[in-house]
């Protein structure tokens, strides 16, 4: 019986000793667009956890898929980063769970379809970008879904 207790105690101690440290945004400092743990001169690589929110850094720069939540549990944003710049899908949600903005980025610039939504889910704006420049036909809508106007990108 003592051996079992000893084995269980050692196991519990080893699991808690090697558990992941929780790091929060407030534990980081930003110097010249690079993030470091406070009291460190090494660029931070790792995951930041704040509640359900998840943020990732690689060599001191934002990296990977960041997911942020409202207090009610709904998703607030899904943002993709690469080497400290927006890269990939960029989606912002209203507190009610409806999308408010949807875009795609490449190397920190809008690149691809771009949508703005009203809180009821209907389109506010539809357009497209090519490396940060608006292109093609842009459409603008009333909240009831009726087209209010069109414009031309570059």
Segments from the language model and where they lie:
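Glycine/tyrosine- and acidic-biased, solvent-exposed loop/turn segments at the edges of beta-strands
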Residues: 14-154
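Sec-dependent N-terminal signal peptides
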Residues: 4-13
């Amino acid at each position: 019986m003592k051996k079992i207790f000893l084995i269980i105690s050692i196991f519990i101690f080893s699991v808690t000793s090697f558990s992941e440290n929780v790091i929060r945004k407030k534990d980081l400092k930003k110097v010249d667009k690079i993030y470091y743990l406070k009291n460190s001169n090494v660029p931070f690589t790792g995951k930041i956890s704040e509640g359900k929110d998840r943020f990732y850094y690689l060599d001191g720069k934002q990296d990977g898929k960041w997911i942020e939540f409202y207090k009610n549990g709904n998703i607030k944003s899904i943002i993709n980063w690469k080497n400290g710049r927006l890269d990939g899908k960029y989606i912002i949600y209203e507190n009610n769970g409806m999308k408010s903005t949807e875009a795609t980025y490449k190397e920190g610039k809008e690149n691809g379809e771009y949508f703005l939504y009203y809180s009821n889910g209907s389109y506010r704006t539809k357009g497209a970008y090519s490396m940060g420049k608006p292109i093609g036909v842009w459409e603008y809508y009333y909240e009831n879904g009726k087209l209010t106007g069109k414009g031309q990108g570059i």
